[in-house]
Amino acid sequence: VVVAGHMDEVGFMVRNIKPNGGIEVLPIGGLVGEVFISQIVYVYTKNGHKIPGVIGSIPPHLKTNNNSSIEALIVDIGASSKEEVLSYGISIGDMVLYDTPYIETFNGKRFIAKAIDNRYGCGLALEALEYFHDKTFDFNLAIGATVQEEVGLRGAETTTNMFKPDMFIALDASPLN
């Protein structure tokens, strides 16, 4: 038996740096473009910097087509040239994640945060490890966390190919209620 949460989250990846300093991004996971316009994001560089930015797109009155897709989004970090962006250590492939605070709901019964389903699943996996660590079973039990759930359940597939379990219990949560 394998029990696992997943520890990846949706986000973006730097795909191009424009001459004017705008950063074009690729979606990672199931994202809908227009909901991200004006959202604060951070570019995480390979040298450890966390650079703030905001997601924008070409204004409707300046568009030459009606492309409102996620691929049309641009991250603005305040740089005025490609050279300036590169001087910050930003490169193709860097992660871009949106910023969401971790807060309680007004009634104090729930939490609001990005990737809460992932965190919930990983937390349950840790609780299961703690609970079952000294128990004996007549079957093998593997507890952990997978990655790449947001891009096609790849980690869970790799785990099942590796362990060949009779049962895989995926720990995840609904984003609403």
Q: Where are the regions a protein language model picked out?
A:
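N-terminal hydrophobic/helix-forming segments and targeting peptides
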Residues: V1-N177
